UniProtKB/Swiss-Prot annotation:
Quaternary context: The nucleosome is a histone octamer containing two molecules each of H2A, H2B, H3 and H4 assembled in one H3-H4 heterotetramer and two H2A-H2B heterodimers. The octamer wraps approximately 147 bp of DNA.
Listed Gene3D superfamilies: Histone, subunit A
Organism: Caenorhabditis elegans
Protein's UniProt name: Histone H2B 1
Physiological role: Core component of nucleosome. Nucleosomes wrap and compact DNA into chromatin, limiting DNA accessibility to the cellular machineries which require DNA as a template. Histones thereby play a central role in transcription regulation, DNA repair, DNA replication and chromosomal stability. DNA accessibility is regulated via a complex set of post-translational modifications of histones, also called histone code, and nucleosome remodeling.
Length: 122
């Protein structure tokens, strides 16, 4: 007897455009990525440079990987300190632990700037 399809398998099957009983077409499931934001940063730094779809895929994987590492480290820090909420302090400490030297300093300063901008706009 074949194994039952998981919930993930059912979602993948829903991606195809089929006509349900009520006659309306189904939409494709959206795939979230950082492509738009990576492209915007590229154009700020090098306006005359393009990027291939394979390079964009690699960059997207890289951003997802770094995000997951920072989130996991911040979660660990919150757990160590018996906190149930991850604050900007845990994120900042996680960035300092994960990123090397000068890169961590720049990331922390940019993050602080972004948080300040967000709180002042509220």
């Amino acid at each position: 007897m074949p194994p039952k399809p998981s919930a993930k398998g059912a979602k993948k099957a829903a991606k195809t455009v089929t006509k349900p009983k009520d006659g309306k077409k189904r939409r494709h499931a959206r795939k979230e990525s950082y492509s738009v934001y990576i492209y915007r940063v590229l154009k700020q730094v090098h306006p005359d440079t393009g990027v291939s779809s394979k390079a964009m895929s690699i960059m997207n994987s890289f951003v997802n990987d770094v995000f997951e590492r920072i989130a996991a480290e911040a979660s660990r820090l919150a757990h160590y300190n018996k906190r149930s909420t991850i604050s900007s302090r845990e994120i900042q400490t996680a960035v300092r632990l994960i990123l090397p030297g000068e890169l961590a300093k720049h990331a922390v300063s940019e993050g602080t700037k972004a948080v300040t901008k967000y709180t002042s706009s509220k």
